[in-house]
């Protein structure tokens, strides 16, 4: 098995919108989406972050879902814990008008490692 001290963290960033987003008048929603676009671009350009994919799951759940409060997910390999914190901090620093993105959304990071099947079990029939 690989030396886990040199491997990046495998992070699932769970992102959602809050009731403040749904309470906005239609003409103001676009400004929030533009902020999300800027935040996603900032994540993809961060040193120490390799975005593996972004999944949007609101095709079958429209609006706020209490049992699944997330709207989209970002799977990324991240250099270290501090870089993971910096990604989450973008919600505090990305402007949306006179506020910041965290007024309209939320983020949670699930940190782990890439799953690897031990070599002795990889080819077992």
Which positions does each model-derived feature cover?
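Short S/T/G/P-rich N-terminal loop/turn motif that feeds into the first structured element of a domain
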Residues: 1-70, 78-82, 112-125
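Conserved, mostly hydrophobic/aromatic
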Residues: 74
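Hydrophobic side chains in well-ordered alpha-helices
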Residues: 86-87
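A common structural junction motif
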Residues: 91-102
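A short, structured active-site edge motif that brings together acidic residues
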Residues: 102-111
